[in-house]
């Protein structure tokens, strides 16, 4: 998901997406440990998406404090 798409979402929607991505990341790591994961790059994508979303939430918090 691109940063521009994330910025169009509300903070509550972003937090919900973070929660679902964390669940997906947990499942991906579990699959990796059991040898069932084929697309290992997906773990990196999910981690980056979570980081992007957290960054945008933090930007909003800092902008609100100004």
From Swiss-Prot:
InterPro entries: Ribosomal_protein_uL29, Ribosomal_uL29, Ribosomal_uL29_CS, Ribosomal_uL29_sf. It comes from the Bacteria. Gene3D superfamilies: 1.10.287.310. Keywords: Ribonucleoprotein, Ribosomal protein. It comes from Geobacillus thermodenitrificans (strain NG80-2). Disulfide bonds: none annotated. One of its GO terms (biological process) is translation. PROSITE patterns: RIBOSOMAL_L29 (PS00579). The keyword Ribosomal protein applies. This is Large ribosomal subunit protein uL29. Pfam families: Ribosomal_L29. NCBIfam families: L29. The keyword Ribosomal protein applies. GO terms for cellular component: cytosolic large ribosomal subunit. CDD domains: Ribosomal_L29_HIP (cd00427). One of its GO terms (molecular function) is structural constituent of ribosome. Belongs to the universal ribosomal protein uL29 family.
């Amino acid at each position: 998901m691109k940063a521009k798409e994330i910025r169009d979402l509300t903070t509550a929607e972003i937090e919900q997406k973070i929660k679902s991505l964390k669940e997906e990341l947990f499942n991906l790591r579990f699959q990796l440990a059991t040898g069932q994961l084929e697309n290992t790059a997906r773990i990196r994508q999910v981690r980056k998406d979570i980081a992007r979303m957290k960054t945008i939430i933090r930007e909003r918090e800092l902008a609100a404090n100004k």
